[in-house]
Regions:
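Negatively charged, low-complexity tracts enriched in Asp/Glu with abundant Ser/Thr
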Residues: 19-77
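Mixed-charge, Lys/Arg-enriched low-complexity segments
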Residues: 4-31, 35, 112-160
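Generic local-structure boundary detector
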Residues: 20, 51, 59, 71, ...
Length: 160
């Protein structure tokens, strides 16, 4: 049993080194609050640089099983829906098996060739503010994730 758990943890850590392509379903272990931000921003920038983006959905999920201090399995889904060249949405969802969840929803609107806004809760943000707002949202959610993952990381170091 101990050997099985050790191998599972090694697999979780090694998944960080896999190459990533836009549009794939990622099973990542996020170690810091910035990790989710880096992945999602890379894909948002890809979309913003496309002249005529096609419909895409990007999902980011913490590799499972990830056990937190309360023994819960934690999962994060970040979905990017591109409806057409002018509109899209970003959704963040955080779940564990104790019933805890957190959800944030953003709309991306393209009004002119180089003008984008993100809107949420009746607030709108200009294109130049997109990365800051995304980082804020990712930080709030991934901080909760990293608190759980630190436990797994520490366990991995002790049995390595």
């Amino acid at each position: 049993m101990f050997k099985y758990i050790k191998n599972q943890l090694i697999n979780l850590v090694n998944k960080n080194n896999q190459p990533k392509e836009f549009g794939e379903y990622f099973n990542n272990v996020y170690h810091t609050p910035k990790d989710i931000h880096k992945d999602i921003i890379k894909n948002i920038q890809y979309w913003l640089n496309e002249e005529e983006p096609r419909c895409k959905q990007v999902k980011f999920k913490v590799a499972e099983p990830v056990y937190g201090t309360d023994g819960c399995i934690l999962k994060v889904d970040i979905k990017v829906y591109i409806k057409d060249a002018h509109t899209g949405t970003i959704e963040f969802e955080l779940h564990d098996n104790a019933g805890f969840s957190n959800h944030e929803h953003y709309s991306i609107l393209k009004f002119a060739q180089d003008e984008y806004v993100i809107s949420t809760y009746n607030e709108c943000y200009k294109a130049e503010d997109i990365l800051d707002k995304m980082e804020d949202a990712c930080h709030r959610i991934s901080k909760k994730v990293s608190n759980h993952i630190d436990v797994v990381d520490d366990l991995y170091k002790t049995i390595k």
